[in-house]
C-alpha cells in the first residue's frame, strides 16, 4: 500500500456550495465504504474489512486454518501490529480517508444559507464522521492491559489518548501539529457532531435505501458513544429513542436463515452498506465482504472453492453456550450427531459440498446475494450491516443493568423471549453476571459485525482461545487476563512523520506479547 498522509484535509477547491457538488459529496461517503486498495494484498476492501479485522481480534470469530488466510491472519495471531507494517497502515489510512470524505460533505454546506435539503446532507455528513471517529476512538484509545505498559518507547504516557481530530475547517499548518485527542476531548467532539446531526438530519428525506443514516441512527450512535463514556443512563435513554424511531423491527428467524437473503438484505437494518456489480470490490471477484465472510461460495477466500479452503467459525465454547432453542444457533453448522444438524439451512446447490468440506461451527450467517454461490458478479453484490435495531435492545439492557441488574435482566429476557428463544431465562442475578450474560447474548447477535471488540475492550473482558477441545488453530490460541494488549491499535509511522504533535506519542507495539497455549 502506498503510504498516504492520513490527516489530509479537503482543499478549498474541493468545496463548492452548490446542490450538485453537495450531492456528489453526500454519496461519496457510502461509496467510500467499499474501496479497494490495489497494493497486492487482498484485505483492503474498505469498512467491511475493518469490521472483519475487529472480530478476528476477539475470541468469538476464528478462521479454521491459515491455508489461505495470509491477508488477515496476523490480526488473529497478534503479529506485525507495529507502526511500520501494512496492517496498521490500512486501518489508520482507511479511516482518515473516510473522514476526509465526511469533511468534504460537511465543508460543502454553509448552515447559514443552506436549503433544507442541504441541511439534511450536512446531518448525514456529521453522523458519518461521528461513526468514524467513535470507531477510531475505541480502537486507538490506550487502556491498561495485562502485557504492555502505557509508557511507550520514548518514555511518554499515552494512556487514554485516541487519535488526532481533523475537521473540515482545519488548515494545513494545524493538521501538521495536531495532537492525539484525550478521551474527554474526543467524547465532546463526537457528541457535538451528533447534536448537530440530530438537529439537521430531520431534513434528510431519502436515505437511499438505508445507505445513509437517519435520525434513529443518530440516536444509535449516541447510545454507542455514551456506552464508551460509561454514561449508562444516557446510553439507555438513546438506545430506547433509537428503537422507537427506527423504521425496522428485529429480524425474524426467516430473515436470518433464508439462504437467499440472510444477512444480505439492507432493508432489514437501520443502516448498512450496499454493493452493486459496479463496485470495485465486486469487480475484483475476491476482494470483498462476501469472499471473506460468506463461507458459502465457490469463488471466495473462504468456502467451497478448494478442498482445503478456510472457513469462518464461531468459537466452540461460545457455540455450546447458545441454547438449542435459540434459532441463532442455526446460523452455524452443527457438529455431527447434533439434533440441530439437519435444521441448518444450506444453499440447495451447495449441500453436497457443505457436507463434504464445511467443518462444524462454520458460519452460514452471511449469505451471498440471491444465494448465488458461483458468480461473484451476483453473489458479491451484497450488503452488510452498519447498525441494526437489535443492538439497541442489548445496549438498553446492559446500560440499565449497571445500576439496576434486575431491570436489565428483565429487559434481556423480554427481547430474547420475544425475538430469539421463547424458552430463554437469564439465570444469574449479580450485577457483573447479568451484564456478562447480556453482553454474551449481544455477542451472539452481532457475531461477525465488528461490535464485540468494543465491548471486550470497554469492560476489560478476557479473551480465551486456548482450552481443551478448542477449535482455534495453534498460532491463534492466545489467552489474556482482561482486555488484550492488541486491542490498543497502533498509529502508522507516517502519522508521526508528518504530524509533529504525534511524534513520540504512539501506542506501544503489542505484537507477540502472548505465549501460545498448548494442550498438555
PLM segments and residue spans:
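Flexible, polar/acidic helix-loop-strand segments at domain edges
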Residues: 322-387
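Short, surface-exposed recognition loops and adjoining beta-strand edges that mediate ligand/DNA contacts
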Residues: 47-51, 140-159, 203-286, 427-429
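Conserved, well-structured interaction surfaces
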Residues: 67-142, 181-184, 198-206, 377-384, ...
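TPR-repeat structural position
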Residues: 187, 232, 405-406
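Membrane-proximal, proline-rich intrinsically disordered regions
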Residues: 1-53, 301-313, 318-324, 328-333, ...
